[in-house]
C-alpha cells in the first residue's frame, strides 16, 4: 500500500493553501496594527490572543472529529479561520482585532489537529515518520511561499484580505473530492487529552514536543533579533533565516525515512545531539552557515519524529487524543521558550539564546538515554 494515498495528497494540497494564508496574515497583522499607531504592548496582546485561540482550538477539536468526522471538521475549521480573516476588515481596533485573531487562532489550531490526526490515522507505525515529514515539508514550504508573497504583492489591508480569504476557501476544495475515514468513531472507549499526557510509555514523545516548541519558538522569534544585535542588515537577516528554514525543509524527508527504518528513539537521540552541537557552534561564531544549517535540519525535524514516537504507544482509536496532547505540548513550549529566552537575552547576553536551547536539549537527551520503555512491537501497529 502506498504511503502517499490520494486522500493524503489532497489533504496536503489543501494544507498548503491554508498555510500560505496563515503565513501572510501572521506577517502582516503586526504591521497593520503598527500602521494604525497602536502601542507595542497592544500589538503583543493581539498576537497573544491568536496563540490563546490555538490553545482553545486544540482542546475541543478531538471531540468535534469524533462527532462529525475529519472532512466536516476540516470544513468547519477553514470557515472559522476565514471568518477571523474577514473580520479584520470590519474595523481596525485593539479589542476588535484581538477578538478576530482569537477566532482565527481557534480555526488554525483546528486545522492542524484535523490534518495531523488524519495523517496519523491514515498511516501505520512503518510509515508515519514519512507522512509527518511530508506534512512538515508542506507546512514550511507554505510558510516560505507566504513570506515570498508578502514581499511581492501590495500589503494594504483591503487589498490583501479578499485574496487571502479566497485562498482559505480554496483550501477546502481538495477535501471535497475525497473522504477520510475516522475509525475512532467505531471505538468503544474515548480518550482524553489529560490521559494521553499522563501515559507513561508516551512521555518521551510529549516531552519531545515541548522541547521542540521551545527550540523552534525561540529560533523563529528571537533569531532575527540575535542577528540584528550582531550588526547585520535586514537583507542579511533574511538570508540567514532562509538558510535556517530551508535546512528544516530539506531535513524532513530524510529524518522521517530514517525514523521509519532505524527506529524513532535512535533518530531522536541523534537529532537532539546535533541540536546541541549546532547551538555550541553558534556560540563560537566561527562557521555560521553550517551551524545554522545543522541547527535547522535537526531542530525543525524534532517535532514530527517525537509525534511518531508517541503515536506508537497508543491504540488506533487514541491517536486523535494523543495528537491533541502533542500539539498542546508543542504550543506550550513555543509560548514559554521565547518568553524565557528573551528575558535572559535582555538581562544578560544574546548568547544565552543558544545556551538555553542547548541546555533544554541536553536535559531531553538525558531522558532519551535512560530506559525509554521502547517495545519491539508498537501498540499502534495497524
UniProtKB/Swiss-Prot annotation:
Membrane topology: Multi-pass membrane protein
Compartments where located: Cell inner membrane
Superkingdom field: Bacteria
Chief location of this protein within or outside the cell: membrane
One Pfam family of this chain: MFS_1
Gene Ontology cellular component list: plasma membrane
Family under the similarity heading: Belongs to the major facilitator superfamily. YcaD (TC 2.A.1.26) family.
Protein name per its UniProtKB record: Uncharacterized MFS-type transporter YcaD
Organism expressing this protein natively: Salmonella paratyphi B (strain ATCC BAA-1250 / SPB7)
